[in-house]
């Protein structure tokens, strides 16, 4: 899983949160201003007969990352090919637990998979951010040889008073469902690396 950055990455760690062969990357992105952004790059395996018969592993990975960022004071971005559509119960649960925002809401679907089939495309690639950011631009880029289109997202870090942005809130049923998913895979939010900003 390659991650390329024009900005310095520090305290980087590659980890295998749920499955021993599915990596994720956790790092701090250092801005020229000196601000640090806690960033998590994920690519859980999709539910499919050739990879995982169920979505349990993918769901657990998303939930433990959501729980790990929920109380973060620093700016946070979680991004990657999550192998899940934007409207799924699991993606909505991720948003509720993490408190992160989906910049696509109200702006379009931005279907990124599959580049070869215009009549069957799904928004599998995601970027979620904390309310430290506002959206400047979001668009799907042209194909570049992959079976996914790139999702270009330009965010602005608001260093003063943050604009109040609405996200989803988890209720007791959501939290119980998340606990069951995580317990089934024997993982927890403490398994997710939390790059320190100091």
Question: Which residues does each predicted region cover?
Answer:
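Soluble catalytic domains of enzymes that build or remodel membrane lipids, polysaccharides, and related
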Residues: 1-197
């Amino acid at each position: 899983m390659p991650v390329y950055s024009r900005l310095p990455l520090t305290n980087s760690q590659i980890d295998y949160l749920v499955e021993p062969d599915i990596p994720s990357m956790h790092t701090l992105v250092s801005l020229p201003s000196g601000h640090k952004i806690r960033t998590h790059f994920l690519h859980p395996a999709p539910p499919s007969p050739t990879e995982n018969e169920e979505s349990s592993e993918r769901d657990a990975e998303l939930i433990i990352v959501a729980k790990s960022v929920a109380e973060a004071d620093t700016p946070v971005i979680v991004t990657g090919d999550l192998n899940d559509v934007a409207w799924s119960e699991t993606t909505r649960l991720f948003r509720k637990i993490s408190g992160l925002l989906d910049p696509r809401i109200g702006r379009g679907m931005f279907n990124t998979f599959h580049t070869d089939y215009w009549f069957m495309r799904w928004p599998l690639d995601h970027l979620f951010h904390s309310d430290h950011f506002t959206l400047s631009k979001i668009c799907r880029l042209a194909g570049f040889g992959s079976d996914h289109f790139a999702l270009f997202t330009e965010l602005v870090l608001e260093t003063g008073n943050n604009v109040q942005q609405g996200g989803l809130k988890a209720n007791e049923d959501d939290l119980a469902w998340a606990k069951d998913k995580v317990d089934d895979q024997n993982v927890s939010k403490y398994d997710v690396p939390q790059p320190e900003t100091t």
